[in-house]
């Protein structure tokens, strides 16, 4: 049997299988697990759709969260998405959040590391590489799981991502 341990910041690993790396996330009705021979992180976020009347309030609430936790470039990108009257701001917010969470899971820093210390956006869109001053560089891969969800995998290098739907009840 393999013993599950936790790293300094809570990242789980198998003591008896140091070559096996995994990351898990769940949101809404989905659960995801990423497995690799290299360190990685995965995060899933359900975008919580509300009616049109609540959309402005929701945009304002997410804007306050972005101002507090996002890097200035990410906050700029999010803000630019709120200007056109569409709901692009919703996808932008949750894509940024999923990317940031997947990075801190990959790096092993956990969410205790201030999200504002690194950016997954250049201010105009999302980036596919992260180069923070405090941790290892990484690649990001955004995946389509289901409409209404943001899913991001992060690792030092990403050559291929295979998705298996286990279809469990």
Model regions: which residues?
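Core catalytic alpha/beta fold that binds nucleotide/phospho-ligands
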Residues: 1-169
């Amino acid at each position: 049997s393999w013993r599950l341990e936790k790293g300094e910041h809570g990242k789980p690993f198998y003591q008896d299988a140091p070559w096996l790396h995994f990351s898990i996330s769940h949101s809404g009705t989905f659960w995801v697990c990423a497995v690799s021979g290299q360190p990685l992180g995965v995060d899933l976020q359900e975008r919580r759709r509300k009616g049109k009347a609540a959309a402005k309030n929701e945009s304002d609430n997410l804007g306050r969260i972005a101002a507090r936790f996002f890097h200035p470039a990410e906050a700029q990108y999010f803000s630019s998405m709120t200007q056109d009257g569409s709901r692009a701001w919703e996808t932008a917010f949750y894509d940024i959040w999923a990317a940031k969470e997947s990075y801190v899971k990959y790096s092993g820093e956990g969410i205790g590391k201030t999200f504002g210390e690194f950016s997954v956006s250049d201010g105009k869109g999302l980036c596919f590489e992260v180069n923070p001053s405090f941790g290892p560089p990484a690649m990001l891969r955004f995946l389509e799981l289901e409409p209404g969800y943001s899913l991001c995998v992060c690792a030092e290098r990403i050559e291929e991502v295979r998705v298996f739907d286990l279809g469990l009840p």
